[in-house]
């Protein structure tokens, strides 16, 4: 149903009953006089009488949907957040804590209102605070590859273009994600099965606007239409929410793409994009930008952070680490646009109990649910099975929309099936699947992906016999999950049972006296493993298993030091603290045997000599007697770092450079010591956070010759700022909250690159030399570059020339800028720096955008025998900017690029 509107006044649809009132904090008071609405004749799907009928049907559907909806309120949970001015329905299930507001309605409430969802119960996906907008102040800019760039006010948008009104179902790509998270945690939060809603949207055609602005031809590069919202978000170091669609979609009249300014007969609510948002029927919600400010026609797809790092379905073997390392986010074939086929059982609801008695067994029980598909494809069939897919029952469909004039369907439909109660009593599971007109259907089993998106496997409801009342039996129904952090669901039970079974399995410790040793596995004592602590033979112990990592020394991303620092020891805790699931799987390739565990921990075969550990022998000498023995004083070390050991360092000062950047100064164990960190290498900070060891690598910004202390410049990643990382940075937040005077363990040195002075490097132990250095950094990756530059500039006899290109999201994100600019002025013949930011303020004198070949050719030295490139930054920057552009410049990337 694509009904057009011919109202001569901009008002709510006649006859629509609203029992809630929009919050006037985002509207003028009194309500403004809106311009008249023109008729979109091109959108007509039938004659005038049919159009009037369609408009009448829409009004009736909205009226029905808005029945029995309580008023929205200022929710106490929003107090103290940037959204404390927005009224919201208190029944909405919050999925990401207090803020940002991401929510879905309880599934029974969603279905109670039928085809049209009341605005207060429409699911919400916000990445940050809701912008405070005013109709009169708002403009939408259309720019890029158009012949007539234009900035439209809201009144002009409504006045100059014909408006149309149509129902559209919106679905979050994460709908049903919690089912995926029960199998394996994705990087997304727990959407249930109510991340779907349907509204009647009124707006102006995007196609008409682009025509008015005279969009360029395809041959001139006008291939993509980018949308940018107004909210300020943390993603990528600070950005707007932006994404894009192909020109063909934007200009296709059958697609019904509109810029919407009304929802269910009212101006948009703040959470849904007031005053204007994009609606792309049949697409995922993530493409429908809210609080729309800019439309940019471009040759390439949108380069925004959220366009690449959100709304992708990557192959199941790709985890977050691999996606970053290998640039999976940027592969176009994994982007999500159109919705896939899906269906859900809504009746019976979760934990519903159906009593089994003479009355209930005399009539059938009606199963109900919803289904939808994408791209305008009609749902043609929904089927239910009670026997695991052996047989299927075809359901009745209730499709309350008419297709548009091109035969497209944009809304969900409802399905129902009557079944005998005794048949339900005999089944263990009810499952549903849907089909669309392209014969797409749902897979039987869940297919995991790292973002947990587009989950559309069979929706299964489990049944169990219960006793609701004395002398009576019944059937209790369980849905797979409950949304957010709510407990419940058969998948949660099964996961808990699996963990319990694993925990209850007997754990057999290998003992020298055990008759059950595995004779097929080599056994090693701790003393034997300790001997393998050199580059010629580097063994480690993790969870009682012995690994020979010698052949991996040259391949370790962090350099051989990362392994050698733990060689010959049990490093279980440290390994767990810093390695991903992928690394843990790789470790199995290097397993050579098992550790022999005994009742004591001494290397000796006699327990009488054991002074520490788990010994139960009562005759051991107390430790205190040994520690009071007269021992010669140990010689004082000139450097603090001891390989393979942690040293305690005291936090003596913390200085705030900006709202999220700190300088931390740590005192060394002795005031006359140097840290002992070679230039180019880094250290680990070690702390117990939330009961677990946390280790993070940092490069000090203080000089290597400083005595008694070292300094770190650290960007603090706060909890609740980035929706994809709601917990923030564990170590950076720990440092920020650490009381002055507290001790922190430090371990090092680590790294495969060492600058030995005057153009000389040791890389994996091999000598390299350069007179000119091309230095590329992104974000916090500036610190190792800074460390090398600092060492060079401190030596007046070091004539190495440095050319730095430093990329950030915004100018405010640039770390150590004052120091870098000072060096560039003081040592203009030896040190040059050029900044690149994605978005810039007026008057910015450096590059805007990304690190391109042009930027690198202009500001870095040419390739040659006397040039080396140094880089440290996010993996996509290294893979897609640094590597290919250096190759184009003639650098031998394999040999002449040193990546920290």
From Swiss-Prot:
InterPro entries registered for this protein in UniProt: Cbr1-like_FAD-bd_dom (IPR008333), Cyt_B5-like_heme/steroid-bd (IPR001199), Cyt_B5-like_heme/steroid_sf (IPR036400), Cyt_B5_heme-BS (IPR018506), FAD-bd_FR_type (IPR017927), Flavoprot_Pyr_Nucl_cyt_Rdtase (IPR001709), FNR_nucleotide-bd (IPR039261), Ig_E-set (IPR014756)
Record: residues binding Mo-molybdopterin: 172
Transmembrane segments: none
PROSITE patterns, per the entry: CYTOCHROME_B5_1 (PS00191), CYTOCHROME_B5_2 (PS50255), FAD_FR (PS51384), MOLYBDOPTERIN_EUK (PS00559)
Lineage top rank: taxon: Eukaryota
Keywords: Disulfide bond, FAD, Flavoprotein, Heme, Iron, Metal-binding, Molybdenum, NAD, Nitrate assimilation, Oxidoreductase
Record-listed heme binding positions: 556, 579
GO molecular function list: FAD binding; heme binding; molybdenum ion binding; molybdopterin cofactor binding; nitrate reductase (NADH) activity; nitrate reductase (NADPH) activity; sulfite oxidase activity
Cofactor, how bound (note): Binds 1 FAD. Binds 1 heme group. The heme group is called cytochrome b-557.
Pfam families in UniProt: Cyt-b5, FAD_binding_6, Mo-co_dimer, NAD_binding_1, Oxidored_molyb
GO biological process assignments: nitrate assimilation; nitric oxide biosynthetic process; sulfur compound metabolic process
UniProt-listed Enzyme Commission number(s): 1.7.1.1
Domain Cytochrome b5 heme-binding: 521-596
FAD-binding FR-type domain segment(s): 644-756
Annotated catalysed reactions: nitrite + NAD(+) + H2O = nitrate + NADH + H(+)
Main function: Nitrate reductase is a key enzyme involved in the first step of nitrate assimilation in plants, fungi and bacteria.
Entry similarity comment: Belongs to the nitrate reductase family.
PANTHER family for the chain: SULFITE OXIDASE, MITOCHONDRIAL, SULFITE REDUCTASE
Subunit comment: Homodimer.
Name of the protein this chain belongs to: Nitrate reductase [NADH]
Organism expressing this protein natively: Lotus japonicus
């Amino acid at each position: 149903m694509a009904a057009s509107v011919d109202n001569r006044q901009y008002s709510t649809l006649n006859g629509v009953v609203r029992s809630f009132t929009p919050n006037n904090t985002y509207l003028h008071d009194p309500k403004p006089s809106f311009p008249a609405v023109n008729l979109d004749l091109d959108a007509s799907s039938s004659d005038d009488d049919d159009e009037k009928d369609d408009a009448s049907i829409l009004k009736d559907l909205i009226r029905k949907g808005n029945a029995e909806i309580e008023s929205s309120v200022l929710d106490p949970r929003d107090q103290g957040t940037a959204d404390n001015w927005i009224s919201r329905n208190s029944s909405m299930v919050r999925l990401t804590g207090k803020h940002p507001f991401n929510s879905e309605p309880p599934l029974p409430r969603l279905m109670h209102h039928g085809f049209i969802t009341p605005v207060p119960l429409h699911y919400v996906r916000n990445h940050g605070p809701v912008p405070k907008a005013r109709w009169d102040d708002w403009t939408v800019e259309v720019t890029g590859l158009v012949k007539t760039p234009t900035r439209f006010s809201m009144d002009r948008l409504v006045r100059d273009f014909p408006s149309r009104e149509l129902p559209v179902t919106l679905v979050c790509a994460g709908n049903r994600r919690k089912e995926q998270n029960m199998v394996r945690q994705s990087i997304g939060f727990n959407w249930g099965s109510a991340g779907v809603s349907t509204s009647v949207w009124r707006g102006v055609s995007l196609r008409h606007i682009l025509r008015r602005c005279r969009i360029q031809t395809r041959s001139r590069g006008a291939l993509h239409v980018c949308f940018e919202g107004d909210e300020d978000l943390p993603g990528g170091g600070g950005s707007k929410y932006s994404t894009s669609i192909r020109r063909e979609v934007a200009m296709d009249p059958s697609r019904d793409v509109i810029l919407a300014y009304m929802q269910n007969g009212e101006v948009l609510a703040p959470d849904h994009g007031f005053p204007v948002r994009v609606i792309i029927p049949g697409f995922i919600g993530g493409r429908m930008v809210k609080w729309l400010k800019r439309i940019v026609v471009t040759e390439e797809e949108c380069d925004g952070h959220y366009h690449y790092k959100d709304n992708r379905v990557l192959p199941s073997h790709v985890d977050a680490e691999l996606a970053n390392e290998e640039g999976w986010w940027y592969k176009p074939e994994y982007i999500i646009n159109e919705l896939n086929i899906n269906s859900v059982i809504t009746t019976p609801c979760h934990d519903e109990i159906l009593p089994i008695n003479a009355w209930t067994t005399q009539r059938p029980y009606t199963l109900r649910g919803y289904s939808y598909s994408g791209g305008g494809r009609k749902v043609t069939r929904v089927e239910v099975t009670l026997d695991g897919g052996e047989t299927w029952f075809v359901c009745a469909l209730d499709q309350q929309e008419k297709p548009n004039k091109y035969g497209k369907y944009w809304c969900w439909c409802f399905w129902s099936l009557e079944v005998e109660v005794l048949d339900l009593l005999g089944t263990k599971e009810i499952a549903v699947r849907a089909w669309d007109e392209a014969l797409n259907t749902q897979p039987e089993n869940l297919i995991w992906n790292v973002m947990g998106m587009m989950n559309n496997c069979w929706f299964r409801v489990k049944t169990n016999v219960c006793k609701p009342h004395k002398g009576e039996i019944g059937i209790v129904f369980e849905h797979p999950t409950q949304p957010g952090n709510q407990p419940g669901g058969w998948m949660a039970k099964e996961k808990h049972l699996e963990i319990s079974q694993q925990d209850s399995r007997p754990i057999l410790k290998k003992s020298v006296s055990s008759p059950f040793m595995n004779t097929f596995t080599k056994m090693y004592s701790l003393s034997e493993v300790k001997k393998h602590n050199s580059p010629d033979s580097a063994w480690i112990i993790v969870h009682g298993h012995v690994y020979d990592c010698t052949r991996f020394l040259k391949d370790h991303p962090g350099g051989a030091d990362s392994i050698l620092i733990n060689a010959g020891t049990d490093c279980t805790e440290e390994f767990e603290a810093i390695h991903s699931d992928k690394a843990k799987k790789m470790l199995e390739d290097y397993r050579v045997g098992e550790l022999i565990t005994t009742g004591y921990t001494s290397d000796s075969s006699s327990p009488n000599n054991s002074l520490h550990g788990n010994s139960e022998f009562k005759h051991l000498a107390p430790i205190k007697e040994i520690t009071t023995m007269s021992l010669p004083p140990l010689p004082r070390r000139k450097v603090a770092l001891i390989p393979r050991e942690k040293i305690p360092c005291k936090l003596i000062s913390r200085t705030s450079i900006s709202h999220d950047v700190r300088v931390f100064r740590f005192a060394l164990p002795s005031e006359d010591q140097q840290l002992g960190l070679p230039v180019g290498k880094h250290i680990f900070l070690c702390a117990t956070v939330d009961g677990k060891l946390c280790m993070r690598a940092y490069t000090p910004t203080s000089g290597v010759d400083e005595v008694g202390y070292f300094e770190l410049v650290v960007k603090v990643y706060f909890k609740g700022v980035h929706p994809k990382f709601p917990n923030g940075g564990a170590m950076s937040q720990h440092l920020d909250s650490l009381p002055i005077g507290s001790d922190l363990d430090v371990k090092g040195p680590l790294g495969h690159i060492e600058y030995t002075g005057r153009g000389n490097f040791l890389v994996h132990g091999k000598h390299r030399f350069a007179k000119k250095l091309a230095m590329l950094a992104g974000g916090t990756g500036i610190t190792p570059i800074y460390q090398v530059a600092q060492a060079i500039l401190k030596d007046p006899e070091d004539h190495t020339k440095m050319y730095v290109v430093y990329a950030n999201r915004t100018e405010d994100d640039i770390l150590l800028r004052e120091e870098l600019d000072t060096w560039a002025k003081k040592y203009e013949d030896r040190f040059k720096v050029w900044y690149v930011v994605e978005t810039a303020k007026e008057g910015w004198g450096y590059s805007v955008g990304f690190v391109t070949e042009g930027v690198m050719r202009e500001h870095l030295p040419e390739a040659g025998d006397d040039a080396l490139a140094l880089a440290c930054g996010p993996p996509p920057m290294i893979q897609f900017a640094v590597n290919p552009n250096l190759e184009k410049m003639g650098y031998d990337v394999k040999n002449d690029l040193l990546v920290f």
